[in-house]
């Protein structure tokens, strides 16, 4: 978005300074979106070719990794959820998690090649996308066992055109996985998830409904955790972590880990939303 704004402003200034006035500035603003998207398509091909050697190396390295692989996507709270999952599981296991902003094929492959080692027991990958096929391609060599979708929102709507398209692009993370953890308060996502239940384990995590597989209630800095309607335990933390905690519990269920023990021994996650 930042690059696009620069492009729009630059073209508009040129139009006005050249004496063509408001009309050409308006036309420039409209067509700059098209020019920007075309530029992205061109650079995307270049980036893909340039990064293939790193992807091949990362895929080979991952092929020898025997632990569970978790992939996370969504329109919001990806980094917060990744950090929360990593922090909770790290109390009992050695966790590899991609660094902040390393969520495309080059960033993910680079972090694998440089930082993943034989001592790691669980790997967590955050995945972003600007269009169709990107997450599917990353999953083809990351091969996640558990996929997490934090929610769908009108981010990059000018490029993706509709929420349904955003949902389809994010849902590519489900194709090769066996278990899916979703934000059960997102109606669009929840409806889509009903199509997955025949072939995959789907765990819906909610901050509003006790009918969900996982429900996290918040009051006075306390998150009360319910599984299948039954109170399990509670943890301290700010309200902005409520969804991330719910999704983390969903992941712990999928991993068949001791939820009470892990949450009890884990320090409060960082209060950060991404």
Which residue stretches match the model-derived regions?
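Phosphate-binding loop of NTP-binding sites
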Residues: 8-199
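Acidic, Mg2+-coordinating active-site environments of NTP-dependent enzymes
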Residues: 149-266, 270
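Conserved small/polar residues in nucleotide/adenosyl-binding loops
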Residues: 1-5, 264-273
């Amino acid at each position: 978005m930042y690059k696009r704004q620069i492009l729009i402003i630059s073209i508009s200034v040129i139009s006005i300074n050249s004496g063509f006035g408001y009309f050409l500035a308006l036309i420039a603003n409209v067509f700059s979106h098209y020019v920007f998207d075309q530029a992205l398509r061109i650079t995307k091909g270049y980036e893909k070719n340039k990064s293939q050697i790193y992807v091949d190396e990362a895929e080979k390295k991952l092929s020898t990794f025997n632990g569970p692989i978790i992939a996370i996507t969504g329109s919001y709270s990806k980094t917060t959820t990744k950090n929360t999952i990593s922090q909770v599981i790290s109390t009992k296991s050695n966790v590899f998690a991609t660094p902040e902003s390393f969520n495309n094929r080059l960033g993910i492959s680079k972090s694998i090649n440089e930082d993943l080692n034989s001592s790691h027991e669980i790997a967590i990958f955050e995945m972003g996308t600007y269009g169709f096929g990107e997450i599917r391609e990353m999953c083809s060599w990351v091969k996640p066992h558990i996929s997490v979708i934090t929610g769908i929102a009108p981010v990059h709507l000018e490029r993706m055109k509709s929420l349904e398209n955003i949902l389809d692009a994010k849902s590519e993370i489900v194709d090769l996985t066996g278990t899916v953890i979703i934000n059960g308060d997102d109606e669009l996502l929840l409806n889509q998830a009903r199509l997955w239940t025949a072939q995959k384990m789907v765990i819906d995590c909610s901050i509003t409904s006790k009918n969900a597989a996982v429900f996290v209630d918040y009051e006075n800095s306390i998150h009360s955790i319910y599984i299948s309607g039954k109170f399990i335990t509670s943890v301290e933390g700010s309200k902005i972590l409520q969804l991330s905690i719910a999704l983390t519990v969903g992941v712990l269920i999928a991993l068949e880990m001791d939820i009470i023990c892990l949450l009890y021994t884990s320090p409060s996650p960082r209060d950060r939303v991404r």
